[in-house]
Each structure stands twice: as C-alpha cells, then as structure tokens.
Amino acid sequence: PTTSSISEWSSSSYGIDPEAHRRFWQLMNDVIAAAFACDTCRVVSMRVTDIFSGFEGDWHQEVAHEAHFPEGGKQAIIAAAHQRFFRDVFLDLVAKLDAIDETEGTVLDHALVQWTQESGAVTHDPIELPIVTAGSAAGHFATGRYVDYRNLNSVGHTPNETNAVATNTGLIYNQWLGMVLRSMGLSPSDYESGAYGGYGIVQLATEGWYAGYQKYGPSVLSAMGQDLP
C-alpha cells in the first residue's frame, strides 16, 4: 500500500464518504491478507461501523431503525450501502486471499470468510439473518450454494402498519457458529455454554418486546449442537 489508513480516517468528510470507506477497508484487507500469508494471524473479526453511504442524518435512528417501515425509502438506502460493502470490501478481501498460493490451493481455499449483519429483516432482531461466505475451510464446507434454512410454516413477524416485513423462523445462528468452530478444529467442549449446543448463550427469558429463543420450538433448540443439513 502507498497510502495510510489514518489519512483516510482523519478526513473531516470521512463519515459520509463511501469512497473513503472503500479505500480504508481495502487497506485493512491488505493487512489481513499479509498476516494470513505469513501465518502471524489465523482469525480476524472485522466490526465495520462505517455506513458506506453519503447519508448525512442519524444512520442508527433514521435508517437502521426504519429499514422495515412500509414506505421503503430507508430499506433502499441500507440495501445500497450493503451492496457497496459487499462489492468493495468483502469481494476485495476474498480476491486478495485467493491470489496467495499455498500447498494444494490458495489461502482462501484453506480459510472461511463470512459476512453478515447484526440484524435480520427487522431491526434488533436476528430472524432471517443473511450470511455470505467464501472459502471452504480446507474442504469442510461445500461452496457455490444458496441455502435457505427458514421454516415457511413458522412465522416470525407479520406485516402491519409499521412493518412491511413478513419473516419466518428457521434454524438458529448459534448452530452455524458452532459448525464454523468445529471446522477450525475446536471441539464442542471448547465453546459450548449451557444446556444447548452451538456457540453463544441461549437466554429463553428475554425482554417483553422480543420473545427471543421462545420463537423456536424444542426440535430446533435441541439441534443446535449438530451440523447444519
């Protein structure tokens, strides 16, 4: 790299400049690719708070909290931002990892890259949480697939005057995370907590406005320690 991420981040217009966001995170991708190639690091977690948009208002309250509203304008804004991130950051990292040759493939072939959101279709709610992956973790995962784990007979949300989204519950995110950890050589005893499998705490009693894991039946909860079908 010939530029500095600090120079990008310190610009007064950085917060609403998606091109600056792209340049900043592509520099981070350079660091990640170099670290993986040198085997100085094997796990990276990218918590991206940049909005990848020129929206000048309160992104949290005026976009993220209103993306499921019937008028649809905020959904278009957040969808465009996600598309920019996918194109400019996720695919950039994947390409850089795939360009580094290793024995029997590339760094990407031996890695798993995951991109997801903190919310599903409705803000603060993990139902219908989309996940995009690249790499097979050295053959542990089949690639080139689209998999839908929703149960279309199990309703998560129904549309109303303040919500345009109809959702369905399905298998639980914790189950996927446990499968990822096992693909990296961990055993369930390394990460499981409580009576259920998968990675992460299961809290059956939650706030009144969100029923949490109560939206899932016992057959789904009991399968959390298994590989996804």
List PLM regions with ranges.
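Ligand-binding pockets and gating/stacking loops
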Residues: 1-229
